[in-house]
């Protein structure tokens, strides 16, 4: 039988429900049960599961306990508001005030604490998490059997699984760790979002190494302000969450984290700051990669290459080298393994069908990232620089004007278009972006065009491209769908860009 959701381990020793109740300090149900799994999704229940019925924004998981029981749940974990509905199924019920906050530790217990058998490296920050995770996994691959968990995909050895979110829910995450252990994986590189830290998705995890890339405004629809955002990220650098931190000394929040972290910290600086433990020197940024020398804490010199373009990817590559060195790998061997990584899906990913100009797709979907990518591409562009860019609906509205302004100021042509409008009016989003572009003084502003239809926007920018130019399609990166009014339609920037180029050549 095929079950929805991420994979589960094939073999799990049953845990008595009474043991789980004792672990949480909850009242022991009159009836015991043998628990072999846990899920928060009633549709993904398997026989032997503890079903975590969580309170939600609109519905309560207890509304679905009958479905869970029908699929083979042997017990329910819920809060006081869900207790009566859960008890009505006749299943034993564990009642705690914060079931979401407890299910990570329960999942770890049920699956036999699989994370303890893995080298766990977690990466957090506003930008660069995905790239750094891929680079770390690439370096680890040279000496270990690896796993990867992040925005684009999950990997267990060579098996690839599509990701639903950057960091899985705690119940799924512990199951994934157990599958990795079962299949001989012994090291995992994993993105850790601020949502994951606040919502308890990494409860039950203690990372061997936690990496901090940077912090800039993002997710302001979720966090009240930058202080709240920083506090969320800083949770990863406490003894409950990690053993050692690797922190970007070039970032102002990184320097603050060095002072406030509750675990030992190793610092790195792509800008060559003399106070950092590890620093980059002799940086040469090329059109598709960069080379540099890493100076270590004992003044050792390591030859390094970032397989991705842009100064920001020097920082991501340096972060990966330092994390792997902290994990005990030889730094030069780590750097060589990272240099061999073939690229990261949707991160400065080149689309080449023989056209006489550079065409790339990038996930940049916040102001800092858009500015960084445009500046990096400007350095390697002989002709004109063109960007296609939109802003997602039902997300942080404060970044729309700055993103429109950044595109207009730093590109010769800025084609503003739809990203994932979700439930919002695409034209209203575009009007806000356009207002931002209009604030750029005319003598600093490139040509600005607006197309609601993303495919039309891509076709328009391709039609303008001349030899020596660069075309950047930004915002969606690896994504393979576009969410318009709650309906996700197939849409892959890489394929649409490729087809547009082929049509102009045809």
UniProtKB/Swiss-Prot annotation:
One of its GO terms (molecular function) is magnesium ion binding. Its EC number is 6.3.2.13. Transmembrane segments: none annotated. Catalyzes the addition of meso-diaminopimelic acid to the nucleotide precursor UDP-N-acetylmuramoyl-L-alanyl-D-glutamate (UMAG) in the biosynthesis of bacterial cell-wall peptidoglycan. It comes from Streptomyces avermitilis (strain ATCC 31267 / DSM 46492 / JCM 5070 / NBRC 14893 / NCIMB 12804 / NRRL 8165 / MA-4680). The gene is murE. Meso-2,6-diaminopimelate binds at residues 395, 419-422, 475, 479. Pfam families: Mur_ligase (PF01225), Mur_ligase_C (PF02875), Mur_ligase_M (PF08245). InterPro entries: Mur-like_cat_sf, Mur_ligase_C, Mur_ligase_C_dom_sf, Mur_ligase_cen, Mur_ligase_N, MurE/MurF_N, UDP-N-AcMur-Glu-dNH2Pim_ligase. The keyword Lipoprotein does not apply. UDP-N-acetyl-alpha-D-muramoyl-L-alanyl-D-glutamate binds at residues 42, 166-167, 193, 201. This is UDP-N-acetylmuramoyl-L-alanyl-D-glutamate--2,6-diaminopimelate ligase. PANTHER family: MUR LIGASE FAMILY MEMBER, UDP-N-ACETYLMURAMOYL-L-ALANYL-D-GLUTAMATE--2,6-DIAMINOPIMELATE LIGASE MURE HOMOLOG, CHLOROPLASTIC. It is found in: Cytoplasm. Carboxylation is probably crucial for Mg(2+) binding and, consequently, for the gamma-phosphate positioning of ATP. Pathway: Cell wall biogenesis; peptidoglycan biosynthesis. It is an enzyme of class 6 (ligase). The modification N6-carboxylysine is found at residue 233. One of its GO terms (cellular component) is cytoplasm. The keyword Aminoacyl-tRNA synthetase does not apply. Keywords: ATP-binding, Cell cycle, Cell division, Cell shape, Cell wall biogenesis/degradation, Cytoplasm, Ligase, Magnesium, Nucleotide-binding, Peptidoglycan synthesis. Belongs to the MurCDEF family. MurE subfamily. A motif (Meso-diaminopimelate recognition motif) lies at residues 419-422. One of its GO terms (biological process) is regulation of cell shape. It catalyses: UDP-N-acetyl-alpha-D-muramoyl-L-alanyl-D-glutamate + meso-2,6-diaminopimelate + ATP = UDP-N-acetyl-alpha-D-muramoyl-L-alanyl-gamma-D-glutamyl-meso-2,6-diaminopimelate + ADP + phosphate + H(+).
């Amino acid at each position: 039988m095929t079950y929805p959701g991420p994979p589960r381990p094939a073999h799990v020793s049953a845990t008595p429900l009474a043991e789980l109740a004792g672990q949480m300090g909850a009242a022991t149900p009159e009836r015991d049960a043998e628990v072999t799994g846990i899920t928060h999704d009633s549709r993904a229940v398997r026989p032997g599961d503890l079903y975590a019925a969580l309170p939600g924004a609109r519905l309560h998981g207890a509304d679905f306990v009958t479905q869970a029981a029908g699929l083979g749940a042997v017990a329910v974990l819920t809060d006081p508001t869900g207790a009566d509905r859960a008890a009505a199924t006749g299943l034993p019920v564990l009642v705690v005030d914060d079931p979401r906050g407890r299910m990570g530790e329960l999942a770890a217990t049920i699956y036999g604490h699989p994370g303890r058998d893995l080298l766990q490296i977690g990466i957090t920050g506003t930008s660069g998490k995905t790239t750094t995770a891929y680079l770390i996994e690439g370096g680890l691959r040279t000496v270990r059997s690896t796993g990867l968990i992040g925005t684009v995909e999950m990997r267990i050895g060579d098996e690839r699984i599509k990701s639903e979110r950057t960091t899985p829910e705690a119940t799924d995450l512990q199951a994934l760790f157990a599958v990795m252990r079962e299949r001989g994986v012994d090291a995992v590189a994993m993105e850790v979002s601020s949502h994951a830290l606040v919502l308890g998705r990494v409860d039950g995890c203690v990372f061997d190494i936690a990496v901090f890339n940077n912090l800039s405004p993002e997710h302001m629809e979720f966090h009240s302000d930058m202080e709240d955002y920083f506090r969320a990220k800083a949770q990863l650098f406490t003894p409950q969450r990690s053993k050692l931190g690797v922190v970007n000394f070039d970032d102002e929040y990184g320097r603050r984290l060095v002072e406030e972290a509750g675990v030992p910290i190793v610092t790195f600086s792509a800008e060559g700051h003399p106070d950092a433990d590890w620093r980059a020197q002799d940086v040469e940024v090329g059109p598709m990669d960069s080379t540099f020398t890493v100076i270590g804490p004992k003044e050792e010199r390591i030859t390094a290459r970032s397989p991705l373009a842009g100064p920001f990817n020097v920082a991501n590559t340096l972060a990966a080298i330092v994390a792997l060195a902290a994990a005990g790998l030889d730094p030069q061997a780590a750097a060589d393994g990272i240099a061999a990584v073939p690229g990261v899906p949707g991160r400065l990913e080149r689309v080449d069908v023989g056209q006489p100009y550079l065409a790339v797709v990038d996930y940049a979907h916040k102001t800092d990232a858009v500015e960084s990518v445009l500046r990096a591409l400007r350095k390697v562009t002989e002709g004109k620089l063109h960007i296609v860019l939109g802003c997602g609906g039902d997300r942080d509205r404060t970044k729309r004007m700055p993103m429109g302004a950044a595109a207009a100021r730093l590109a010769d042509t800025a084609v503003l278009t739809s990203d994932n409008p979700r439930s919002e009016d695409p034209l209203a989003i575009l009007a806000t972006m356009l207002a931002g572009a209009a604030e750029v003084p005319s003598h600093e502003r490139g040509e600005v065009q607006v197309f609601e239809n993303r495919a039309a926007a891509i076709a328009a920018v391709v039609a303008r491209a001349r030899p020596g130019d660069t075309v950047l399609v930004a915002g969606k990166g690896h994504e393979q769908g576009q969410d318009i009014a709650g309906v996700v339609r197939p849409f892959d920037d890489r394929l649409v860009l490729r087809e547009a180029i082929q049509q102009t050549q045809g």
